[in-house]
């Protein structure tokens, strides 16, 4: 399971740009404090880096 990431949305998308909201939806996050488990890939890492101030990653 070392190649999996647990991503939690910790900041609301209210006030975020449209692109940031699209990245949140692209990661499969819909609600505040929702956690998803995704495979660790360059694509996922790139999306995380765009909105890292809104996420908690394990």
Curated annotation (Swiss-Prot):
GO cellular component, as recorded: cytosolic large ribosomal subunit
Pfam families registered for this protein in UniProt: Ribosomal_L30 (PF00327)
Keywords, in A-Z order: Ribonucleoprotein, Ribosomal protein
GO term, biological process aspect, one: translation
Membrane spanning stretches: none
GO molecular function: structural constituent of ribosome
Superkingdom, taxonomy of origin: Bacteria
InterPro entries: Ribo_uL30_ferredoxin-like_sf, Ribosomal_uL30_bac-type, Ribosomal_uL30_ferredoxin-like
Subunit structure and binding partners: Part of the 50S ribosomal subunit.
Family: Belongs to the universal ribosomal protein uL30 family.
Protein name (database record): Large ribosomal subunit protein uL30
Top-level taxonomy: Bacteria, Pseudomonadati, Thermodesulfobacteriota, Desulfuromonadia, Geobacterales
Protein's gene: rpmD
């Amino acid at each position: 399971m070392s190649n999996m990431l647990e991503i939690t949305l910790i900041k609301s998308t209210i006030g975020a740009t449209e692109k940031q909201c699209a990245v949140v939806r692209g990661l499969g996050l819909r609600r505040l404090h929702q956690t998803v488990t995704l495979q660790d890939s360059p694509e996922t890492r790139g999306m995380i880096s765009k909105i890292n101030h809104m996420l908690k990653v394990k």
